[in-house]
């Protein structure tokens, strides 16, 4: 390990790699001092022009937007290694880097709008700014996942206008969105006739389990419905094993139609059972004189109400829940969408959201790029290092041709190389003699 005579701190291998970045970070500080800029603002800033600046930014970007680690913790680590960097410098530097990623994100959006199957979800996201017409700091992080792209948007609204604006560029005559039963998606489907909603069976299953947990008297009934829903998954899986995506539904093999018919029969039995149960609710509540007590009439009023509500919701959303039958490419649940929003949610536990609108926009862009890389099996560290190096070689601007950095344009050989763990050098062999600690400072 080397020794810094100015600070009296021993540098590790990592700090040696990032040593040159302190000069570029100083340039950002000098530039802000000259312009009087605010590190949290949105002013136009040029990225640092050091040949080694990308190394520290790779660490910052991956730590914050991919691993969900607090940036201050990383900066404390650098400080302990003799590389003090202020949080304001990092905030200003990230905003300076934002324009480099805009061409990539624009291309991701165009690619996604050429596809036909999507998974959508949303969650809260705090943006600590005050804007006219909005009370509080509660914003929302929206995710749209397609076969090729994972795209994010952070917006102050949770209305149908947000997915409506996103899908305004949709090119397909018909598209399927796998989602939960949130009303914004229902309104979107009413306004956009080329969008078909496929509702998530995992949420329906959760309805029954929640009812069983809330009312002990409904536990057995809820578990029975859990088993009914559970039988659909293996039937659909067996059907998909025989499915040929190149053929229409009627042109599929005999084995496909065998499982297809079994799936339809199971769904029909489920629908009939739910219909009978809902129809019998009035008889359970007020049985006629001399009439036999209907099954379930021993339940409390609140339990009967809960049971009816769950079954009524199942029937109300039945058409969306059975989209996967006629469109085998549509999954039965929205697990892919929910998995895609998990990484930002984990990071939210540490940073609580974004401190400015610009910061929120940058977060959405980097979430989209990094999660799309993961979708394609590409190591984000490989990609980010090469992309930022190309930006540095292009005069601190995005490359004129970004096709070599688009996952779907990368040939198989190069994609295999980019999917491997990032190579690291072993630190220099330690001296057999202990290194004295410099206490002169």
Spell out what each predicted region is.
Residues 1-27:
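Short, conserved DNA-binding cores of transcription-related domains
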Residues 22, 26-441:
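Catalytic center-proximal scaffold of phosphoryl-transfer enzymes
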